[in-house]
From Swiss-Prot:
It holds the Pfam family Y_phosphatase. It comes from Dictyostelium discoideum. This is Tyrosine-protein phosphatase 1. Residues 33-63, 382-410 have a biased composition (Low complexity). Keywords: Cell membrane, Cytoplasm, Hydrolase, Membrane, Protein phosphatase. GO terms for cellular component: cytoplasm; plasma membrane.
């Protein structure tokens, strides 16, 4: 993952000394069998390895002379440098990230997945313990007299808008036709594949598209051998980007005389039970998908679900969904740069309970209490021990310039209630004084409520943070025209002219395979 570098800014002074902190971790060996995948995260083994990094500095935003201090006479460059001060330090504090991730395991209760356990559906699950949640599962149109014909191992996932994603497993040979049926019935135009077909000599996803340019038929059968319907899948074009390990396939899907154009993005640079070495190819993938969405015709199909899968459809898939949701929030955020003074937009970016986080000897029990209380309040989770936790708005307003901080440590039950009002949200205020929520913990929690195991490993959770930090660096560089220090894992790929739409990447390093005559895909 590279390293995170920071400039310590304390007590009104700026130190020239740069500390480099390597936050990369050793990857644990996967624990899995032929029929199941381990849902226990790698966090236990990762914690001990990460703990060996020693005590990491936890400088907090309020100790910076720039934080929430619009009267401080600084040039724009210095204001921008201070804008991501807290986020960098939050990522550096491994013990905080570990506690966040641990609390995810405790904050989501058991889910009802009985549909996937039914006898006629078990053969359709790639892993016996990765099943779709009943209340969010994708239900296919039923075929008369065919039991289980509405079942596929997939869930609708709400993100920036309802049903932004369909998260699913890598198709099996006996579910490929159902996969294309799901694509058709939901009018999906984009498929994201975050795995190779095989990894470590194990099949992770069966090929559901033609291997060569041309067409292939996938039929849906009824109760007997009668054909319920036939989907024609034609591979039109393949674009290979070996540098970023991204393959783009343009596919035509035809059913009952109607044809739709589908784009599949396969990212091969993300190994199973692991993370990419750099965020740049992954972020480029996200921008390419955004571009493609904006080009979809008819425009009414631009907000249909994006189908996302890896092998099990939880780890890499959940990490992707988290990053996309955060990117949407960044789009909103950067629109404010033209309308609002930079320091007013950026300074409240990652408001934290400062005093609680300043100590290197952090009380994880107390921190856990804060996190749980925050989630109970923001998500309406019933917590019998916290009936008085209903006044988060007062704390939230502190991020708009106030230096108020919560108590350092709860000493009794009464103090617990006061401290628990602190809402650990990383947010900014837009020009209408509305909070833009950047709470990554909350995003992952909501994803897990819709499909268990999303963002499966601690390393993946940390990768989400690193992706957003690198994206902030890159966008500020492009937007403001000056270089920020300590920009890691960012290459000079195409600079986009605005924050919501990027230009198509150069194909200088790509290989395009297509017929001699090819009409433009819609």
């Amino acid at each position: 993952m590279g390293s995170v570098e920071s400039s310590n800014q304390m007590n009104g002074s700026i130190e020239n000394k740069t500390n480099k902190i390597d936050i990369s971790v050793l990857r644990p060996l996967p624990t899995r069998s032929n029929s199941s995948i381990s849902l226990s995260s790698s966090s236990h083994s990762s914690f001990s390895r990460m703990g060996s990094l020693g005590s990491l500095p936890t400088n907090s935003g309020s100790s910076s002379p720039y934080y929430n201090n619009s009267s401080f006479d600084l040039v724009d460059e210095e204001r921008i440098k201070s804008s991501i001060y807290n986020l960098k330090n939050h990522i550096k504090c491994i013990h905080k990230i570990k506690e966040e991730f641990r609390l995810l395991e405790e904050s989501v209760g058991p889910s009802e997945t009985s549909e996937g356990d039914k006898k006629h559906n078990t053969s359709k699950n790639r892993y016996t313990n990765i099943l779709p949640v009943n209340h969010t599962r994708v239900q296919l149109k039923k075929i008369q007299d065919k039991e289980g014909s509405d079942y596929i191992n997939a869930n609708y996932i709400d993100g920036a808008y309802p049903k932004q994603f369909i998260c699913t497993q890598g198709p099996l040979p006996n579910t490929i036709a159902d996969f294309w049926r799901m694509v058709w019935e939901n009018r999906c135009r984009i498929i994201v594949m975050l795995s190779r077909e095989s990894e470590n000599c194990r099949i992770k996803c069966d090929r559901y598209w033609p291997e060569q340019i041309g067409g292939e038929q996938f039929s849906i059968y009824g109760n007997g051998n009668e054909v319920f319907g036939t989907y024609s899948v034609e591979l039109v074009e393949v674009i290979q980007d070996p540098e970023r390990e991204i393959i783009t396939r343009n596919i035509r899907l035809t059913f009952e005389g109607e044809t739709r154009d589908i784009t599949q993005y396969q990212y091969e640079g993300w190994p199973d039970h692991n993370i990419p070495d750099h965020t740049q190819p992954f972020r480029q993938l996200l921008h390419s998908i955004t571009n493609r969405q904006n080009q979809i015709i008819p425009s009414s199909d631009r907000n249909v679900p994006i189908i996302v899968h890896c092998s099990a459809g939880v780890g890499r898939t959940g990490t992707f969904c988290t990053a996309v949701i955060m990117m949407k929030k960044l789009d909103h955020y950067f629109k404010q740069l033209d309308a609002t003074p930079i320091d007013q937009v950026v300074d409240p970016f990652t408001h934290l309970p400062i005093t609680e986080y300043q100590s290197d000897n952090l009380d994880l029990k107390g921190l856990g209490y804060h996190f749980k209380s925050s989630i109970y309040n923001s998500n309406g989770i019933n917590n019998n021990n916290n009936n008085n936790l209903n006044n988060n708005n007062n704390i939230n307003n502190n991020s708009n310039g106030s230096n108020n901080t919560p108590q350092t440590e709860p000493n009794n039950e009464e103090d617990d209630d006061d401290a628990a009002e602190s809402d650990l949200k990383y947010a900014i205020m837009d020009k209408y004084n509305s909070r833009i929520d950047f709470n990554l913990f909350s995003i992952v929690l909501k994803l897990r409520e819709q499909r268990p195991g999303m963002v499966q490993q601690l390393e993946q959770y940390l990768f989400c943070y690193k992706t957003i930090l690198d994206e902030i660096y890159h966008r500020l560089n492009c937007k403001l025209g000056f270089s920020l220090p300590h920009v890691n894992n960012i290459n000079n790929y195409n600079n986009y002219s605005n924050t919501t739409t990027t230009t198509t990447s150069s194909l200088a390093s790509t290989t395009i395979i297509h017929p001699s005559t090819n009409s433009k895909l819609n």
